[in-house]
Amino acid sequence: MDRALSTFPGDDDETNERNINHREKTSGEHGHYEDKLLDLSEEEPNMIKIKNDIKKIINERYSNYISIDDDEISDILKDSFISNEEMQIKDFVLRLLVLEKLFQTSVKECNSLKNIIKRLENHIETIRKNMIVLTKKVDFQTGRSTTL
C-alpha cells in the first residue's frame, strides 16, 4: 500500500481535484508558480551601499532599541515609493504625516501602558503588604508569635 486510505468516502476524489487545480496554476518542470519573486542577488551596487548605510546608522544610533537584518532592509527598499525616478512632494509629505501620526499614537499608547504598569505595581505592593499583615495575624492567633 503506497498511500493512506481515506476516512470518509469521496475524500480521494477531492484530493485528486486539488492536485489537478494545483497543476493548472503551476508551470515548468519543478511546479513553481508563474509569479516570480524579486531576485535579491541581482541588486544594484548602489542599493548594496544604501543597505550598508542603513545598517551602520541603526547599529550606531539605535542598537539598544532595534535590530534589523538584510531581508527587512530589502523589503523596505523594494517599496515602489523609493524606486520611483521622480519624487512627488505631495506623496512625500503625506507619508511623513502618516509616520508622524503613527509615532504620536505609539508614544501615547506607550505612556498609557506605562501608567497601567505603574498602577499594577502599586496594587501588587499593596497585596504584598496585606499578605504580610495577614501572616502575622495568623501566627499570633495560632500562638506561633507573641507580638503583632
Curated annotation (Swiss-Prot):
Protein name listed in UniProt: Putative fusion protein
Keyword Membrane applies: yes
UniProt main location, coarse: virion
Stretches with biased composition (Basic and acidic residues): 16-34
Assembly, per entry: Homotrimer, covalently linked.
Family: Belongs to the poxviruses fusion protein family.
Gene Ontology terms: biological process: fusion of virus membrane with host plasma membrane
Record's keyword terms, sorted: Membrane, Virion
Places the protein is found: Virion membrane
InterPro entries registered for this protein in UniProt: Chordopox_Fusion/A27
Region (Disordered): 1-34
Cellular component, GO, one term: viral envelope
Keyword Metal-binding listed: no
